[in-house]
Design a protein with these regions (language model features):
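Beta-hairpin "wing" of winged helix-turn-helix
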Residues: 55-69
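C-terminal regulatory/oligomerization modules of transcriptional regulators
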Residues: 98-160
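N-terminal helix-turn-helix DNA-binding core of bacterial DNA-binding proteins
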Residues: 6, 12-39, 58
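Conserved segment of winged-helix/HTH DNA-binding domains
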Residues: 73-98, 109, 113-118
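Short, hydrophobic-biased segments on the C-terminal half of alpha helices
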Residues: 48-49
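Alpha-helical residues within the helix-turn-helix
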Residues: 35, 52-53
Length: 160
């Protein structure tokens, strides 16, 4: 079953929360975000530290400090957040650095699974945090046009 880890899910929620902060407004604390979404604070604090170390967030020290996005939300993809927390997305062992399994020589599903893997990566790379925080539209990089973020739209991108 393909599934985001809880850490990646919480990371996306936190980054989306920060993207929804008005303007270049105040920083949001880990506690504020954890309380807003019912996320365990110690776990969220570790996730936010990881996102800070990878350059997606920066921390603001002080009593009114917290975390802010290091880049504009339209410049951060869902894939970047997931990768920062969990590392590369690996659908099967044949997509690891070693790329070998017991069935490598006789495998009949490697190529179809590679296509699925690439489609997932491509889609996650195209979904920005801005889109996640906004009106549910998918902004197409080629044209800049916004289209409804629907099943039909995903099918037209050849990812469903």
């Amino acid at each position: 079953m393909l599934k985001l880890t809880k850490k990646a899910d919480y990371g996306l929620i936190a980054v989306r929360h920060l993207a929804a902060m008005p303007g270049n407004g105040r920083a949001a604390s880990a506690k504020e975000i954890a309380d807003a979404y019912g996320i365990p604070l110690p776990l969220l604090a570790k996730i936010l530290q990881k996102l800070t170390k990878t350059g997606l967030l920066f921390s603001v020290p002080g009593s009114s400090g917290g975390y802010k996005l290091a880049r504009r939300p339209e410049k951060i993809s869902a894939l970047e957040v997931i990768h920062a927390i969990d590392g590369p997305i690996i659908l099967t062992t044949c997509f690891t650095a070693h790329g070998h399994c017991d069935q490598s020589e006789k495998c009949t599903v490697r190529e179809p699974l590679r296509k699925v893997h690439e489609a997932i990566i491509h889609l996650l790379d195209r979904i920005t945090i801005s889109e996640m925080a906004g009106d549910g539209s998918l902004c197409l990089p080629e044209t800049g046009a916004k289209t409804p973020f629907t099943t039909e739209r995903l099918e037209s991108l050849h990812v469903l």
